[in-house]
Amino acid sequence: DGVVTGFGKIEGRPVYVYSQDRAVLAGSVGSAHAEKIAYVIQTARKLGVPVIGLNDSAGARIQEGLSVTSAIGKIFFENSIASGCIPQISAIMGPCIGVGSYSPALTDFIIQVQNTSQMFITGPAVIKEVLGKTVTMEELGGAKIHSEVSGVTDLVAKNDEECLGTIRKLVGFLPSSFESLPPRKENSDDPARALDKLETIVPEDMKRAYNILQVIKTIVDDGEFFELKAKFARNLV
């Protein structure tokens, strides 16, 4: 019904996944489609594992009538119940309209593919009709607008392959649920090491500005720092 669901492992850790198929009715969300997504989120929560959504949807399949609105409500309910219990990660990999944007916005992390994905409530044609303004899909909900202006998007990927790689990396930083600890791995940095480089980064004059990112990358293990919302609210890290 336009969505493939299942489970697997990332670096040996179990995850649940659902992936919308634009080749089937433009990835629109019908009753069965919504029920499958809601069930996957619910199951992931009960098992205490992350859930990942690969989103590419034209929105609600309104020709199904009121039954679809009830089923879609179950997705939002499960998103809300799972919040704070398990990591919920959304990849926006194509145009996501209406309900295709609502559910990802309720999740913890959003990764958007540059140039090929958009998130908006209603499209350019409706904006033109109602407001008399002409906007493109990118201007309305592209990766740039959401990563730099609205702040909805946490990470931007250049293509689908990079998006999936980013998800793998992100999962590696997160606990499987609120009941577990984040994963640990061996590194080459000595916890008691001296960081002489900090003396060249932080100025003696407290009124002078300096790049806090350089400080963070010097302190963290192996210089590995995974930043979210890098281009939104640039005064914050």
Positions of PLM-derived features:
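Long, structured ligand/cofactor-binding scaffold of large enzymes
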Residues: 1-89
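Terminal amphipathic helices with adjacent charged low-complexity linkers/tails
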Residues: 155-213
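Conserved catalytic cores of soluble enzyme domains
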Residues: 55-179
